[in-house]
Every structure is written in structure tokens, then in C-alpha cells.
Regions:
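Small/polar-rich, solvent-exposed N-terminal microdomains that initiate assembly or binding
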Residues: 1-35, 94-95, 99
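Hydrophobic/basic alpha-helical segments enriched in Actinobacteria
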Residues: 1-4, 31-34, 47, 92-96, ...
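Acidic-leaning, charged glycine-interspersed low-complexity segments
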Residues: 71, 81-136
Length: 168
């Protein structure tokens, strides 16, 4: 966390991303099951959809002068603004393996219950220019059930009358 002690120990320009809040994005919650298909497009498993969480970060720049901090934050903002969505190919490990894009919001409207000034006060640090970065990320519940084998035979239909005779 960017506390006074942490700030006193740094000796080079630093961009710090401090995770200050985690909340489920209940608007994205889905019910039911999703089909997992193999390379032949055959359903091999069914799984619960992932749960989505809003991760809120306080992004700050730490240098010797305020002007350098502003320039560094400007560079961070210029890097993040065009990136409204991160595709699965750019996500690490199991997060990328889900095949879902991850939306980013930078310097958006503060909708969480705590203001950034309250966060700074709780950290015991001086108020600094910062960016609020919100990453909405899926959490894989890893609850998959194998699907039954696909039906490969054609259906057989036979008609009988009430007495069981086939002469219909």
C-alpha cells in the first residue's frame, strides 16, 4: 500500500497500483450451465458460468517532483484509455484460458461507497493525484460436469396398435 513508510523507502520513479476494493458485479451473474465444446464442436462438458468481480485499483505515480508524477500519470492514462477491453489472448494463465474479454474503466465516475480521499486517509498517506482503475474480471467456479456421449445412431421408430401388433 502507498503509505508514508513505503513512500520514504522508494528511490526510483514508481507507478503503484493498490487494490482497495473487490465487489461482485451481480449484474453480470448468469444462471444455468454453459456448454464446453471440443475441437470438433461436440459438447464434452457442461459448466457453471463464471462469477464476475469489480477490482478497484488506486493508481499513483511516485517521483521526486509533482511535475514528473503528473507526466507519469499522463502516460499511464494514455496507455489505459484506448484499452477498454482486454482480449483473452492478452490475459495471463487461467484467466486467458476462459476465453472471455475483461473490461477496464479508468478515471471513471466513483460509484463505490468509499471516496478516494477516504482511502488515502485510511492509508495514513498524503493525498496525491491518482487514477481510479476498475477491472471487471471473471472468476472460474471450476465446476464442470461431463456431458453424456453424443448420440450417433439414427432413431428407430416402430408403431404398434393397442394389442401390440405391428400391422399398422
Amino acid at each position: 500500500a502507498p503509505t508514508r513508510d513505503w513512500a520514504a523507502r522508494r528511490n526510483a520513479p514508481v507507478v503503484n497500483a493498490y487494490l482497495y476494493d473487490i465487489r461482485e458485479d451481480v449484474a453480470r451473474r448468469q444462471r444455468g450451465q454453459m456448454a464446453v465444446r471440443d475441437e470438433d464442436d461436440i459438447v464434452v462438458r457442461r459448466r457453471q458460468p463464471p462469477r464476475w468481480f469489480r477490482l478497484s485499483y488506486l493508481v499513483t505515480a511516485w517521483t521526486k517532483t509533482p511535475q514528473d508524477e503528473h507526466r507519469l500519470l499522463s502516460a499511464v492514462l494514455a496507455t489505459l484509455l484506448p484499452r477498454e477491453i482486454m482480449p483473452p489472448s492478452e490475459l495471463p494463465g487461467s484467466l486467458g484460458a476462459l476465453g472471455l474479454s475483461v473490461p477496464l474503466t479508468v478515471a471513471g465516475i466513483q460509484t463505490e461507497s468509499r471516496s478516494l480521499a477516504e482511502i488515502w486517509s485510511a492509508l495514513g498517506g498524503e493525498l496525491k493525484p491518482s487514477l481510479d482503475l476498475v477491472v471487471v474480471t471473471p472468476w472460474d467456479l471450476d465446476r464442470a460436469m461431463p456431458a453424456a456421449p453424443p448420440v450417433t445412431e439414427r432413431p428407430r421408430i416402430s408403431l404398434h396398435d393397442r394389442d401390440g401388433r405391428d400391422d399398422l
